[in-house]
Amino acid sequence: MEPTLQSAMEEQLKILREISDRLAAQEARWRSRESTVTQHSRSIHDLEVAMASAPSATLRAELDAPVAVTYERLDATEAASAARVSALESTTATFDMLFDNSDIVEKFNAEVVADDWGGLFGQHAHPLDSGGARLLLPSAALPFASATDTAFSSIYGVECGTIHTYTAALTRPAALHKPLVVAHAKCSTPGHNRVCAETQRQGPRQARRQCRLRVHVRRLHFTGLQLHVRQHGRRRQHVVHVQRVLPGAELDGRGLRLPWPRVAHGDRPFRAHLQLHHIDPDGGGGGGHGITPPERWLSRAGAYNAAAPNEVDVLRWTLKGVLWPRVTYCIAGWIDLGDGVAEGADHAVRVRFRVDDGCVVEGGTVCAESGSWTEIKGVFRLKRNARVMEVYVQGAVAGIDVKVTDPQVFATNVIQNLAYVDFFTKHFDWAVFEKEFRWYHVEDAAKVFDKMLTKGEEAPSVQRGVVMTAVAHNLLVQALFMDGRASDAYVVLEEMQNNGPFPDVFTYTLKVLKNGQWAEEESTILVPGDIIGVKLGDIISADTRLLEGDPLKIDQSALTGNFCICSIVAGMLVEFIVMYPIQDMVYRPRIDKLLVLLIGGIPIAMPTVLSVTMSIGAYRLAQQGAITKRMTTIEEMAGMDVPCSDKTGTLPWTKLTVIKSLVDVFQRGADQDAVILMDARASCTKNQDAIEATIVSMLAAPKEACAGVQEIQFLPFNPNDKRTAVTYMSLIYALSPGKA
């Protein structure tokens, strides 16, 4: 054997020995940190785990009991960790275990290493193997995992026919800011309602001790994820975070992929998971408004499979004594289109609720995209006690799988302002938010909104709801919402400050004659000698000399600081540039005095009056079926004589067209082609606007408009006459016989 090959093999063997030693050390370290499980007596309460096909849902107090599990730090004796643990807040937490559908779940453990938590869908995960199933937990899922230490967690399986209770203490930082991925198994017993009633009277600490019930495991089923944290010395129980992770789940940058069973009809399988939440303005799970604590909430898992596309699918859900009137609830979930849908395709999916065959609430509409999970959220409020609630899922899909899990406390920054919530809950009945928080009024405006939702139109926005509410209740609304262009102006000012006195954002385009052709050029690159064409509304930042044209008016205040308008001529002109724009503005001190007089002459209430006037105009337009998105739209509509739109009342395409068959002829002997030709001759063929370009394009050849005529005078469009006019002379050619 050659020396070189032998040395290479020895090097490879050395590397393999190092890898083997590292694996052995890692295995020894895992086993040394394995925690113990304390098994209690098996004689107290035998609770049956609820299946997915559970009977009609009842109160959570009659159905559910959590399997209490606690994680305990085992490396607290180390010097580096001991000092850190003493500074942490010790909190007792109740976790719900996650199992699969097998009768026996093997014990499994894993080392959770601190890592970056990449948002709700982190890309880093560690596998936990259990009886062939694969469970992925985010590496930073446990709240006591940090960048400076390694936390060890062991999850133990439950054997059929045995009773287990897991309790201990969780050591965590004072601020629980990272989500903890856990799950729960549903249990029931006839005497559980009496136990919960007794514990509620004895106080939260006694309730915590007595609700740690032993579970007789017969069969387990995946139902969802939740975390209840009870803090010492506080009377409130909080649900910190909700997230679903099942065996075989994959976490990647595009979303959370779950191996849920799906039902496919045709080529569009579909599945969805919904969770019902409760929004408590006080911030506590068992806070005010007569709301029952989480232990008394409904718990139900069910599924309904559609059999036809575009079918209204329903999941009947009994809610007697659970949902309360005048309390805001949130419905949230994840939607996934099946593999049969083409990559990148999307479908609109809508969730609706019907309570007691009466009130129909829109729970949210989302455009689900194939290849990833799409989140859907909605908020609703009930006017009266609800006994039965039906969940509908509408969408362009052939099969669905809807799963509804426990109600949870839902918190968001939008509803943290109690004054904001109090104002809207007094005047609004329910809300839906997709990308923004939207409120809908309960008065007459709600009928208009319901018609819009029935027709499939866009849901009303916050601005329209606030305006209509203010008008209906005689409320004064001023400057609640800022126009988006105000922020754009701020960006422009910043760019102007950074780029100098002539930033690129202030450039304008003009028609410039180049090589005998008219082309659009930026006004800042004009040079002396360029010939430009100007029409109404053009801005020229240069000194020019008039070559030809008709009467027009030019505002020179931008160049000289003079606020007076110089009357020269009115219409189209061609100018010859003499010099580049002047660099300095001539400032006149008298402008200060004029500005003071101008501002002093404006009434202080004018902005309010204008805002209210525009709001009333928007409300009256809404009564007639015209919905305006911006207040300035009303002013723009005042300058229109004939609005053109499609059958839905919108303008989806910013392109003008003329239908030849609809052209009216008012002169005998004339036809539609002659009228179109006359219109084309009255249009500008060089520096055209949108209307002129549309009319000229109707001719077979654009040059046909000027063929055989000589233009004498052209009057461009002006706002007073609202027309263009041209004076021309026909050219008559005398042909003499000769050779062609």
Curated annotation (Swiss-Prot):
Keywords: Transposable element. PPR repeats lie at residues 469-503. InterPro entries: ATPase_P-typ_cyto_dom_N, ATPase_P-typ_TM_dom_sf, ATPase_P-typ_transduc_dom_A_sf, HAD_sf, Pentatricopeptide_rpt. Coiled coil: none annotated. SUPFAM superfamilies: Calcium ATPase, transduction domain A (SSF81653), Calcium ATPase, transmembrane domain M (SSF81665). GO terms for molecular function: nucleotide binding. It comes from the Eukaryota. Bs1 is probably an active plant retrotransposon. This is Putative Pol polyprotein from transposon element Bs1.
